[in-house]
Amino acid sequence: MKHLVTTALAYTNGPLHLGHARSTYIPADIFTRYLRLKRENVFHVGGTDNHGVPITLKAEKEGVTPLDIVDRYHNAIKEDLDSLNVSFDSFGRTHSDIHIETAQEFYKTLKENGYIYEKEIEQFYCEKCSMSLADRYVEGKCPFCEGEARGDHCEVCGRHLEPTELLEPYCIHCNSKPEIKKSIHYFFKLSAMKEELTEYITNAKEMPEHVKNMALRWIEELHDWDVSRNLTWGVPIPKSNGQVMYVWIEAPIGYVSFTKELGEIWKDYWISKDVQSKITHFIGKDITVHHAVFWPGILKGVKNYKMPDSVVSGGYLTLENKKMSTSKNWVVWVKDFVEKFSPDYLRYFLMVNAPLNRDTDFSWDDFQKRINTELIDIIGNFSHRTLVFTERKFGKIPNVQKDTLKEEDLLLIRKCEKTTETFDKLIREYNFKDAIMEIILLSKEGNAYFQAMQPWAITDEERLKEVMYTCCTTLKYIVYLLSPFMPVKTGELLDLMNEELDLEIRGNDLKKPKVIFTKLEEMDILKMKEKLNSEIKFEEKVSKNEKTAKKTGAKMELIDIEYFTKVDLRVGKVLEVEDVKKSKKLYKIIVDLGNEQRQIISGLKGDYEVEELIGKNVIVICNLKPAKLCGVESEGMLLAAESDGIVSLLNIDREISLGSKIH
């Protein structure tokens, strides 16, 4: 049996956050690693989705091309995945020759088979900008709750919208009211496949039940699908009037085009009737219908392609019991996480916290507690005490005659074998939480056995060998089963054991034991909490200003030179720095301005150490009204720049007298 495992294509308008990792990429990698562990033939295919309005909007906002945005975030996403140890056999992009060619072939075949037709629709057109407006180019008020809404979605009430439903619509480029014009679009005759899709979903034995149920509900009211857009960025529709394919008809075709990058072997997974293969898609639950209904419909329409065997739909991840929001920066980015903590800790926590098909929450407190009291106190404790004791007594895993083992030894080894069987079943059912809990239970059994045997009190060397052999065998099973979840930490344990990733005990010399699982410190968790809260406050302020500007059509306010000269900016030098007692973020800083010293309260704690600040030249606003922060008076402000959470104080590039005025 050959396996093809795919992950939902990451959208190249931003980097990855923990929600992406939890729903899709980590579980897919765990599943792939386990199949490899069992010596099964498996390819892991993924990539990025590079077309659609959000990318063109971001490019326009930044004054760059869509390809610039795609290149930037394709690379950033791949770096994020690499940092989580998520590996691929093929990682492609939809803005590539092989994908565009494959997508156009699919479209032509659908048309030849009678599944594509033309239809006149109504859509917004902006006279001022001389362009048709795709859904994301229009904003206004939601017709249901009157909240601020995009042309396709209301963030307030969560409803899907059509652009023409909006109240008080306006073009996001010029803020003018668009008019409705008629346009010819191309539609996919999905409604004709109702019976075929119902039969496919009903008979898909490995499809999770919640995915089946959602798909069957949608199929009941199946309607045709507008698959063209009046845009220039995308996969061109052959022989059309300059339109491109809607991303949700061309993006899933990436699973085929990216497999093609492996060579002719791609046919074994997608076409060949002579090769047994299974296709498993890992996705987030927000795109379940696209993969369980729309994508199978496309495959049915082109004919001769194999159908997905399973669509594994991961639930949503909230953050501190609130919905994640990239626009509000209420999110933990993968890059920020791995700079502080082991990616293995994230892989473990996100899988053990809840069944994959259910929504769950990421909280910094729960993360710390689960890692410290479960992973480290149970698995880490058993592994460390076993290796320390065995290395000190024997220098290697002792060799024993299996028929001399006592019943209590055999009982634990049989538990290892039984756990392996249960674990296999759970992984193949995508039940990663319960699979990890089996490892935890086995580790508890190991700890209980170690404690009951009291190896430190055993005087018979042969009996001690049997006990430590049993402990090391149990540890080998734990490492083997845990390896798909925590490839780095288990690799370090195997290195100490001088063993291979299998269930055989070779009895090689052990290396000097060291602590593999280190506890999460309170200060590190506190810093991540403070970073999250400070960023959300900043984003809320920016968002409020942007919304006001949108409503009024306002641009950035320009000021006269006289206004600027009212600000008294001077060069100073930091003399003293101490903590503000009532604050976790503030320093009390004494600055020398040449002819006087000022006391300034600044939120630089966490960005600069005390030693870094003392003696540093700084730029000071000297004519601010004094203000009290945490009960301490501040007589000015230091100037600093901030980007992506990095703070940098403004400085001067040559020696100049303290107190010098900045013009």
UniProtKB/Swiss-Prot annotation:
<dbReference type="GO" id="GO:0006431">
    <property type="term" value="P:methionyl-tRNA aminoacylation"/>
</dbReference>
<keyword id="KW-0820">tRNA-binding</keyword>
<dbReference type="Pfam" id="PF08264">
    <property type="entry name" value="Anticodon_1"/>
</dbReference>
<dbReference type="GO" id="GO:0046872">
    <property type="term" value="F:metal ion binding"/>
</dbReference>
<comment type="subunit">
    <text>Homodimer.</text>
</comment>
<dbReference type="InterPro" id="IPR002547">
    <property type="entry name" value="tRNA-bd_dom"/>
</dbReference>
<dbReference type="Pfam" id="PF01588">
    <property type="entry name" value="tRNA_bind"/>
</dbReference>
<keyword id="KW-0694">RNA-binding</keyword>
<feature type="domain" description="tRNA-binding">
    <location>
        <begin position="563"/>
        <end position="663"/>
    </location>
</feature>
<dbReference type="InterPro" id="IPR041872">
    <property type="entry name" value="Anticodon_Met"/>
</dbReference>
<dbReference type="InterPro" id="IPR014729">
    <property type="entry name" value="Rossmann-like_a/b/a_fold"/>
</dbReference>
<keyword id="KW-0648">Protein biosynthesis</keyword>
<feature type="binding site">
    <location>
        <position position="326"/>
    </location>
    <ligand>
        <name>ATP</name>
    </ligand>
</feature>
<dbReference type="Pfam" id="PF09334">
    <property type="entry name" value="tRNA-synt_1g"/>
</dbReference>
<keyword id="KW-0067">ATP-binding</keyword>
<feature type="binding site">
    <location>
        <position position="154"/>
    </location>
    <ligand>
        <name>Zn(2+)</name>
    </ligand>
</feature>
<dbReference type="GO" id="GO:0004825">
    <property type="term" value="F:methionine-tRNA ligase activity"/>
</dbReference>
<protein>
    <recommendedName>
        <fullName>Methionine--tRNA ligase</fullName>
        <ecNumber>6.1.1.10</ecNumber>
    </recommendedName>
</protein>
<feature type="short sequence motif" description="'KMSKS' region">
    <location>
        <begin position="323"/>
        <end position="327"/>
    </location>
</feature>
<feature type="binding site">
    <location>
        <position position="142"/>
    </location>
    <ligand>
        <name>Zn(2+)</name>
    </ligand>
</feature>
<keyword id="KW-0436">Ligase</keyword>
<dbReference type="InterPro" id="IPR015413">
    <property type="entry name" value="Methionyl/Leucyl_tRNA_Synth"/>
</dbReference>
<keyword id="KW-0547">Nucleotide-binding</keyword>
<dbReference type="GO" id="GO:0005829">
    <property type="term" value="C:cytosol"/>
</dbReference>
<dbReference type="InterPro" id="IPR029038">
    <property type="entry name" value="MetRS_Zn"/>
</dbReference>
<dbReference type="InterPro" id="IPR012340">
    <property type="entry name" value="NA-bd_OB-fold"/>
</dbReference>
<dbReference type="InterPro" id="IPR033911">
    <property type="entry name" value="MetRS_core"/>
</dbReference>
<comment type="similarity">
    <text>Belongs to the class-I aminoacyl-tRNA synthetase family. MetG type 1 subfamily.</text>
</comment>
<dbReference type="GO" id="GO:0000049">
    <property type="term" value="F:tRNA binding"/>
</dbReference>
<dbReference type="InterPro" id="IPR013155">
    <property type="entry name" value="M/V/L/I-tRNA-synth_anticd-bd"/>
</dbReference>
<keyword id="KW-0030">Aminoacyl-tRNA synthetase</keyword>
<dbReference type="GO" id="GO:0005524">
    <property type="term" value="F:ATP binding"/>
</dbReference>
<keyword id="KW-0479">Metal-binding</keyword>
<feature type="binding site">
    <location>
        <position position="145"/>
    </location>
    <ligand>
        <name>Zn(2+)</name>
    </ligand>
</feature>
<dbReference type="InterPro" id="IPR004495">
    <property type="entry name" value="Met-tRNA-synth_bsu_C"/>
</dbReference>
<keyword id="KW-0963">Cytoplasm</keyword>
<dbReference type="GO" id="GO:0017101">
    <property type="term" value="C:aminoacyl-tRNA synthetase multienzyme complex"/>
</dbReference>
<feature type="binding site">
    <location>
        <position position="157"/>
    </location>
    <ligand>
        <name>Zn(2+)</name>
    </ligand>
</feature>
<dbReference type="InterPro" id="IPR023458">
    <property type="entry name" value="Met-tRNA_ligase_1"/>
</dbReference>
<dbReference type="InterPro" id="IPR009080">
    <property type="entry name" value="tRNAsynth_Ia_anticodon-bd"/>
</dbReference>
<keyword id="KW-0862">Zinc</keyword>
<comment type="function">
    <text>Is required not only for elongation of protein synthesis but also for the initiation of all mRNA translation through initiator tRNA(fMet) aminoacylation.</text>
</comment>
